[in-house]
């Protein structure tokens, strides 16, 4: 019965998505001269957003503090999100998914992050792990590895970062040596989200040992089953924030991977790995906006309740101005991720906008979390109140999926290139 319900839910939401895209297309052709574009969501997008919002507020927020304290993996919440169609929604319809675009996925992500970014990151790691397969997998690979994700609440992971290769992806040392119809992989990965929970990994390894070969041709992307002999999963890391998310190191010792699990072909891995970021960075930015919105809401609620010097905090100009600045920032950050998502859904290269969204939203999340703690005063520094968790959770948005500094390098490069042309 549960399986039948799941299938029915998939069909219903697939129809909704088709209608959503159709309405979007029709609206574009019916616009009045000079209107340009609309900020209005379609009814289907509002439904996705409302479903995610209800789930976050009613099911995530009440238990988020306990998951933060225990560090326990939030599988019950992930399973529920899967049942609601809030996870893996971008998997193509041909593989049993909903085939949602990046914009729709961002709407869902922002709402989930409002509830808890640890839970949202565990879910979002699936998107990053799956994206190389969505972009570069053949039909057989997609049906095998993406299809199974729609039949059961499974997880996957993106295995690229290493102990000495974070932002400098080209410094990866994990090696893949071809032997007959297999590749033998040796190396170590680090800071892998869902590392201990994944059913399979996207793994980037150097397949050409010649250091003179450019990164664009030196690396190969593989799909690796998590239970393959030779894979050793490290302990769960205790991080500053987003503690319920599963982060680990993974060692690969003579791991044999069939050639059928190579994405596109030998040497194509670097471009695949980097191309995935154009589609996942907008959703990371959306997660940061969700946290920022939560910080603003918590600070506003507190300022409307707390009294000092005989009047409400919000009646003090200094506090009201701070809230105004917070509101300005969260709205602008939201627009940045929506532009980046809209660009890629429109079929255009969005590297420039994706990096702007990721960098700006990550910075704003940290600023607003800090401002919320400031408005709470001493209470904000205490674990009995929600904003200290927001402050801890926010920092990683300036680090993972490309640091704030790397985003600025990308933005500068893209900007200068645009100016020259």
UniProtKB/Swiss-Prot annotation:
Family: Belongs to the acyl-CoA dehydrogenase family.
Record-listed E.C. numbers: 1.3.8.7
Protein residues bound to FAD: 158-167, 191-193, 306-308, 316-317, 374-378, 402-405
Chain positions with N6-succinyllysine modification: 30, 69, 179, 212, 217, 235, 259, 271
GO MF entries: acyl-CoA dehydrogenase activity; flavin adenine dinucleotide binding; identical protein binding; medium-chain fatty acyl-CoA dehydrogenase activity
Signal peptide: none
CDD domains in the record: MCAD
Pfam families: Acyl-CoA_dh_1, Acyl-CoA_dh_M, Acyl-CoA_dh_N
GO cellular component terms, A-Z: axon; mitochondrial matrix; mitochondrial membrane; mitochondrion
Known pathway: Lipid metabolism; mitochondrial fatty acid beta-oxidation
Organism the protein comes from: Mus musculus
Protein's job: Medium-chain specific acyl-CoA dehydrogenase is one of the acyl-CoA dehydrogenases that catalyze the first step of mitochondrial fatty acid beta-oxidation, an aerobic process breaking down fatty acids into acetyl-CoA and allowing the production of energy from fats.
Main location: mitochondrion
Annotated residues for binding of octanoyl-CoA: 167, 216, 278, 281, 349, 351, 401
UniProt KW keywords: Acetylation, FAD, Fatty acid metabolism, Flavoprotein, Lipid metabolism, Mitochondrion, Oxidoreductase, Phosphoprotein, Transit peptide
Protein's name according to its UniProt entry: Medium-chain specific acyl-CoA dehydrogenase, mitochondrial
Transit peptide start and end: 1-25
């Amino acid at each position: 019965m549960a399986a039948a319900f799941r299938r029915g839910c998939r069909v219903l939401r697939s129809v909704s998505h088709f209608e959503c895209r159709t309405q979007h297309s029709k609206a574009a052709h019916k616009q009045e001269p000079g209107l340009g574009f609309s900020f209005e969501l379609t009814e289907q997008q509002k439904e996705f957003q409302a479903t995610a919002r209800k789930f976050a507020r009613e099911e995530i927020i009440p238990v988020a503090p306990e998951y933060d304290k225990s560090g326990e993996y939030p599988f019950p919440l992930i399973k529920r999100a899967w049942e609601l169609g809030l996870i893996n929604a971008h998997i193509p319809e041909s593989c049993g998914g909903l085939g949602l675009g990046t914009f729709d996925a961002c709407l869902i992500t922002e709402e989930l992050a409002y509830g808890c970014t640890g839970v949202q990151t565990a879910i979002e790691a699936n998107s990053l792990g799956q994206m190389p397969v969505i972009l570069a997998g053949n039909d057989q690979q997609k049906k095998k590895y993406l299809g199974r994700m729609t039949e059961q609440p499974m997880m996957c992971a993106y295995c690229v970062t290493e102990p000495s290769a974070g932002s400098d992806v080209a410094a990866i040392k994990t090696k893949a040596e071809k032997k007959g119809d297999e590749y033998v992989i040796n190396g170590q990965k680090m800071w892998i989200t869902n590392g201990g929970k994944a059913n399979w990994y996207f793994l980037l390894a150097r397949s050409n040992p010649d250091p003179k070969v450019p990164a664009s041709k030196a690396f190969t992307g593989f799909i690796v089953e998590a239970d393959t002999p030779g894979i050793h999963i490290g302990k769960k890391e205790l991080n500053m924030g987003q503690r319920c998310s599963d982060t680990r190191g993974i060692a690969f010792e003579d791991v044999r991977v069939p050639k059928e699990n190579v994405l596109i072909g030998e040497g194509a891995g670097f471009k695949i790995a980097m191309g995935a970021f154009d589609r996942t960075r907008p959703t990371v930015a959306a997660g940061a906006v969700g946290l920022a919105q939560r910080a603003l809401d918590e600070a506003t609620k507190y300022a409307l309740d707390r009294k000092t010097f005989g009047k409400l905090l919000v009646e003090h100009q200094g506090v009201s101005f701070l809230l105004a600045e917070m509101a300005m920032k969260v709205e602008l950050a939201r627009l940045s991720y929506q532009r980046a998502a809209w660009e890629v859904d429109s079929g255009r290269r969005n590297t420039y906008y994706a990096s702007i969204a990721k960098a700006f939203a990550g910075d704003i999340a940290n600023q607003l979390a800090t401002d919320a703690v400031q408005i709470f005063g001493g209470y904000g520094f205490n674990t009995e109140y929600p904003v200290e968790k927001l402050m801890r959770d926010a920092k990683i948005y300036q680090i993972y999926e490309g640091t704030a500094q790397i985003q600025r390098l990308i933005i500068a490069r893209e900007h200068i290139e645009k100016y020259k042309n």
